[in-house]
Amino acid sequence: MVVKPVKLKNLTFDGRHIYVQSMLNTRADDIAGSVAQAVALEKAGCGIKRCSIPNESALELIQAIKASVSVPLVADIHFDYRLALAAAERGIDKIRINPGNIGSVDRVKAVADCCRKRGIPIRIGVNSGSLEKDILAKYGSPTPEALCESAMGHIKLLERFDFDDIVVSIKSSDVQRNIAAYRLMREMCPYPLHLGVTEAGTYNMGLIKSAIGIGSLLCDGIGETIRVSLTDDPVKEVKAGIDILKAIGKRGGVRLVSCPTCGRTKIDLIGLAKRVEETLADVDKDITVAVMGCIVNGPGEAKEADIGLAGGDGCAVIFKKDKIIGKYSEEEAFTALLAEIEKL
């Protein structure tokens, strides 16, 4: 299904570019801390930021953050539709609501009318933990069909009010259910999809669940924006999201290839690979770098890398594609590799 383009400030959700987003986890009344985190997220490559607006005083965040960063800001609104109206009046770029907990139809209409007049898109955010009681009773659990029925009901309500600048998310903490729901949703509507696995957990498990739940959908051509949800620093969410896009060829940058090591490895490859990864994290080059333990893996198995290093007995060779260009001691190899990367 062809995606209906939806504009968000200077961005367009149309499938041509996948935007990485995150959400502030500072207290809503901590203006200085929230601004500092927003700046850190933008520096890390976050394309869209979201903040909770739980009460009227939190509205002060909007102007403070927008004055400090350039990327779009999304207000996360629950229960009180008046906060959505006030956020729009203060210049918010996008609003995330669950129409099911905003209140009466008239209140949803008020939000839709306000956003339409200002060109503000709305994300319908449906989660497995907040489905309507009648839908849960119908399906017995938050099945993919239940999630999609809820989302479609909210979509039709906004469309009824002549509003179609819509982005949709239908998140579950169950990875397989999440994937099935998004695949079904893509068949049912043309609106841009915001991908994510909700309540994914702490860093290690959350990263694995998100890589599977988000990455598999992106490989199917599904999804226009992603958020990796982690019980951790939001900057890590952004870096994880960017790495997922790199891994499936949806984002440029340095891609590191390294072997798991074995009994043939005679250098500290694990330490070396970590140093290379950390050093190249912010390098703006669209290249693949291989760090391999022995000549079996590199340059042989890593011949498709633009440049790489293969360990020997206390030494290492550096190669471009499948050609060796130099041999160095283990101590010199790291610096020599960086020097060759700089030439690319």
PLM features per residue range, with description:
Residues 126-127, 135-281:
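Catalytic alpha/beta core domains of metabolic enzymes, predominantly
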Residues 25, 42-65, 96-104, 166-175:
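Glycine-rich, proline-tolerant flexible connector loops at the mouths of alpha/beta enzymes
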Residues 18-24, 49-51, 73-77, 95-97, ...:
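Hydrophobic faces of well-ordered beta-strands that scaffold small-molecule active sites
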Residues 37, 41, 50-90:
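N-terminal active-site wall of soluble small-molecule enzyme domains
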Residues 16-33, 52, 71-79, 135-148, ...:
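Active-site mouth loops of central-metabolism enzymes
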Residues 56-77, 110-122, 182-193, 276-278:
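Alpha-helix-loop-beta-strand connector modules within alpha/beta enzyme cores
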Residues 1-23, 28, 116, 278:
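N-terminal amphipathic alpha-helix/helix-capping segment at the start of soluble metabolic enzymes
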Residues 82-123:
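Hydrophobic or amphipathic alpha-helical targeting/insertion segments
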